[in-house]
Amino acid sequence: MSELNPVDNQKVDSINVDKSSPELKKHTFEAEVAQLLHLVTHSLYSNSDIFVRELVSNASDACDKLRFEATNDDSLYEDDGELKIRIAVDEDAKTITFTDNGIGMNEADAIENLGTIAKSGTKAFLDKLSESQKQDGQLIGQFGVGFYSGFIVADTISVETRKAGEPADKGVRWVSDGTGSFTVEPITKETRGTAITLHLKEQYSEGEESYLDRGKIKQLVNKYSDHISLPIQMRKEVWQEDEVEEGSDTPANGQMVLTDEWETINKASALWTRSASEIEDEEYIDFYKNITYDMDAPLAWTHNRVEGRVQYTQLLYIPKKAPVDLYTREQQHGLKLYVKRVFIMDEAEQLLPMYLRFVKGVIDSADLPLNVSRELLQESRDVKSIRDGNARRILTLLASLANSEDSDKQEKFAQFYAEFGDVIKEGVGEDMGNQERIAKLLRYATSTQDSVTTSFEDYKARMKEGQKAIYYLTADNLAAAKNSPQLELFKKKGIEVILMTSRVDEWAMNFLTSFDETPLQNIAKGAVDLGDLQDEAEKAEAEKAQETMKPIVDKLKTALGERAKDVKVSTRLVDSPACLVVGEGELSPQMIQMLKQMGQDVPESKPTLEVNPDHPLIKKLESSEQSAEDFDKLAQVIFDQALLADGGQLDDPAAYLRRVNELLMR
């Protein structure tokens, strides 16, 4: 049995476009849409159910936009303020129609919204995606183009729409088969809003994969869209028994028949408005998947009503995986903002500090004005209060995972740190008010433990008696850190050193100079002061070496010229001939290299060369048989080797190799 079109009580027929009509206009999809349509039809067939989620979500957004616009002009409701979404199935025409009485579109809107992707960087992002990522159903929603998911199951899509507040004869019909073009023509549409009709492909209109099964559609709505605050309705079915003659012993047969009554098939209440004690974990997970288009369940979440000077509800999620665009300029971040349950905007980045840009969720404020703009969000004291509250809540959630005795929660924190640890470190320099909270979450490998599990608190608990500082070393990777010449003295004395191998570490440590009143010391910067861990005999020997090596040190300064800021006898080397050291507050070679790669101007900075007086290569410099030319070559080689060991790059690798070869041939 066919259903009536939920908009105009007209039967939904197959599309017959009069291509000779002078009002019919044909348009070509922009390149990004064509690429996306190809992706939809060829890669996402295994996730065909998602079209229900996407089209219901779009309908909900359209109603949210109308509600928002109507706060300034309630005539837009056109005497129909009961917002709703309806889904109609027509078995004869093999169609499904999704209808809303939301904001609607005019011709220009339809061409822009359905024919282009209004997001910068989309094409580049699509080009970068690997084949495995293209199988992920969350891709579609990430671009805000969920409408196109209809082409997974439909060979043709028709859209009939009219913008709220415009006359009936300003309706628009948009039609496409998804192969590269679409047509637009004017129609008369008495009701505002949008009706999207999917003409199902044969494989999706019969058999087990059929979407003409109303029960299946209801299940998908319950799975993906139960939280939608608007009523989602379908025609009610009732059991009707066949008539039997009075007195007959034959049992009555019957069938399900459609009525003219529409029934709501979802809970129709915003999840975050309900008490947390009433919400099942599965409901939280389904809601997360719906608003983020992430196929994975979230790692953790927190749901709270905040009372005080500013009242708001927060429902915040930590994803399981970092998005591929986490570090790109086009990366979309921020929360959905509602004011008194009225949707205001997506991606309200002002509600979170940048280092928490991976957090997803919803904020519903009772105090912000309904006409709040992004500009106003940047200036509002209330928004700052909400942002600070969100940051504290997320950091508290992470701390509860990190400090839990429960192995599952510990594993969740390990997962989180592997995905988002580097982003959290940005907060050390960006959020001074929460710096201590953030520092407690940081984890590192050390010179005695390769696993990235040691916190500053753990390190302090293992410090040697008499140790006055938390020692750390930055490097490009763990292998480079473990083999760094700067570690040699610490290994000899059994002093543990934290090994930092992320590019953001050195930047972050510029802001974190102590932890729990214990200073942090980079062992590759400045002089090494082991304090009580260095005995008097060692100090006396070091002072003696300074005197005996002075002639060689002076010659090295001359040979190296402008390459080195200074040359000194080292107290930190045991096995290596030399190492490079920078002063406190100066940039390391790795940091300089990173900044140059980012195209930034880097201030001139020269390292100090420290030499090991006990190493045979350094002793060779003292040889009276050494010519001035060979001394200079050996000095340059020693400096270059120290630079390489420190993770730097040679300005002239060929010259380095030539000098090494010449010395080897002597």
From Swiss-Prot:
Pfam families: HATPase_c_3 (PF13589), HSP90 (PF00183)
Keywords attached to this entry: ATP-binding, Chaperone, Cytoplasm, Nucleotide-binding, Stress response
SUPFAM superfamilies: ATPase domain of HSP90 chaperone/DNA topoisomerase II/histidine kinase, HSP90 C-terminal domain, Ribosomal protein S5 domain 2-like
Region described as C: 594-666
Cited InterPro entries: HATPase_C_sf, HSP90_C, Hsp90_fam, Hsp90_N, Ribosomal_Su5_D2-typ_SF
Domain of life: Bacteria
Keyword ATP-binding attached: yes
Region named B: 375-593
Subcellular location(s) of the protein: Cytoplasm
Molecular function terms, GO-annotated: ATP binding; ATP hydrolysis activity; ATP-dependent protein folding chaperone; unfolded protein binding
Renumbered residue ranges of the record's region A: 1-374
Keyword Chaperone applies: yes
A GO cellular component annotation in the UniProt record: cytoplasm
NCBIfam families, per database record: PRK05218.1 (NF003555)
Chain's role: Molecular chaperone. Has ATPase activity.
Subunit structure, as described in the record: Homodimer.
Similarity field: Belongs to the heat shock protein 90 family.
Protein name: Chaperone protein HtpG
The organism of origin for this protein: Psychrobacter cryohalolentis (strain ATCC BAA-1226 / DSM 17306 / VKM B-2378 / K5)
